[in-house]
Amino acid sequence: MNRLRKGDEVIVIAGKDKGKRGSVSQVMQNGKLIVDGINLAKKHVKPNPMTGEQGGIVSKEMPVDASNVALYNPETKKADRVGVRVEGDVKTRFFKSNGKSVDA
């Protein structure tokens, strides 16, 4: 079970965007995440007359390693570690600081 999922609110704990918050928009298989508004890079795009795309410089979100982000706990308003608790056949994620469920 992945500790971070699409739609989770995360906070960056290392790197150039340290301290910024965002929502996970994509989880990749190689342990990287794409977070809205984090790790923006400028990409030069060629115009494509076939599709009608205009050329120019575009800001694009680049992947961030999962080890550089932590789940944001809205109760404590801080980054928090995540654990997995097995209740019967169901796995649920919980915050390590207060034991409350993430998915509730």
From Swiss-Prot:
InterPro entries per UniProt: KOW, Rib_uL2_dom2, Ribosomal_uL24, Ribosomal_uL24_CS, Ribosomal_uL24_KOW, Translation_prot_SH3-like_sf
PROSITE patterns linked: RIBOSOMAL_L24
Gene Ontology terms: biological process: translation
Stretches assigned to coiled coil: none
KW RNA-binding (keyword) present: yes
GO molecular function: rRNA binding; structural constituent of ribosome
Entry GO CC: ribonucleoprotein complex; ribosome
CDD domains per record: KOW_RPL26 (cd06089)
Domain of life (superkingdom): Bacteria
Keywords from the UniProt entry: Ribonucleoprotein, Ribosomal protein, RNA-binding, rRNA-binding
Pfam families (UniProt xref): KOW (PF00467), ribosomal_L24 (PF17136)
Known role: One of two assembly initiator proteins, it binds directly to the 5'-end of the 23S rRNA, where it nucleates assembly of the 50S subunit. One of the proteins that surrounds the polypeptide exit tunnel on the outside of the subunit.
Subunit (UniProt): Part of the 50S ribosomal subunit.
Family: Belongs to the universal ribosomal protein uL24 family.
Protein name, entry field: Large ribosomal subunit protein uL24
Organism field: Hydrogenovibrio crunogenus (strain DSM 25203 / XCL-2)
